[in-house]
Amino acid sequence: MLSPFLAYLLSVVLLCRIARSQYSSDQCSWRGSGLTHEGHTRGVEQVYLRCAQGFLEWLYPTGAIIVNLRPNTLSPAASLLSVCIKPSKESSGTHIYLDRLGKLRLLLSEGDQAEGKVHCFNIQDGALFIEAVPQRDISRKITAFQYELVNHRPGADPQSLSAPCQPCTDAEVLLAVCTSDFVARGRILGVSEEDEQTSVTVSLSHLYRQKTQVFVSGGGRAKRWTGFVKMSRQCGVKPGDGEFLFTGTVRFGEAWLSCAPRYKDFLRVYQDARQQGTNPCHLETD
């Protein structure tokens, strides 16, 4: 028979193990397995992800997990964030719901995940409730997706990666030069329509900044870069003469356009702001 002290110690150890099984996170990404439920197929595990981007991978899903996506720092602006997730095309074995105050709304069925399309929702819409689909054989089932927190321009659709189809104000253009994932000067070579978006082929004479390598150099003495930028189909962009200043964000490895004034118009705005000392950052325009 166990002594009172050993019995107490054993109960503490068991409680710690239960707590670890119910609450887990590594801040940015999470990888887990349904096999850890040890037969409790209706168990629900809490996952907390607090970075701007990361991934989730759930092997052999059983029961359910609740994924809480929140930024590291709390501020009034955080309520304007959208969460975008991109499932792997091999993702299967679960349905994904939005859980707001205990009310579930289907976001992605098991079949929807296989399309690999990006889906966005407002961060205030709740956590993700990911429920395993009952299976006789779970050995080949893996639910996996990437996620990013997106800060949209005012007026943007929180359920889309694209910026609103309206010209940026002078102030928005100047700020975009400082804060965008990519800033470049170039021309539009071609436009192709896709299912829910437009893909624009661009040739760049100046690449001021790119967060990741979405534009590639053509080599040679006359340095030029080429690549693609995405935007909403409703924007109705067409190939045309003249140079533009392209700014935007990189989402899931793709460049999405935000502000794109004609370069001569940007130059006028930038030079005026520079003379008045109101430009928020410097850009080499020579």
From Swiss-Prot:
What GO terms describe the biological role, i.e. biological process, of this protein? brown fat cell differentiation; energy homeostasis; negative regulation of inflammatory response; positive regulation of brown fat cell differentiation; response to cold; response to muscle activity
Q: Which GO terms describe its cellular component?
A: extracellular space
Query: What does it do?
Result: Hormone induced following exercise or cold exposure that promotes energy expenditure. Induced either in the skeletal muscle after exercise or in adipose tissue following cold exposure and is present in the circulation. Able to stimulate energy expenditure associated with the browning of the white fat depots and improves glucose tolerance.
Signal sequence bounds: 1-21
Record's keyword annotation contains Disulfide bond? yes
User: Which keywords does UniProt give here?
Assistant: Disulfide bond, Hormone, Secreted, Signal
Q: Which GO terms describe its molecular function?
A: hormone activity
Q: Which cysteines are joined by disulfide bonds?
A: C28-C51, C84-C120, C165-C235, C168-C259, C178-C281
Q: What is this protein called?
A: Meteorin-like protein
Give the protein family.
Answer: Belongs to the meteorin family.
Q: Where in the cell is it found?
A: Secreted
Organism domain of life? Eukaryota
Tell me the InterPro entries matching this sequence. Answer: Meteorin-like, TIMP-like_OB-fold
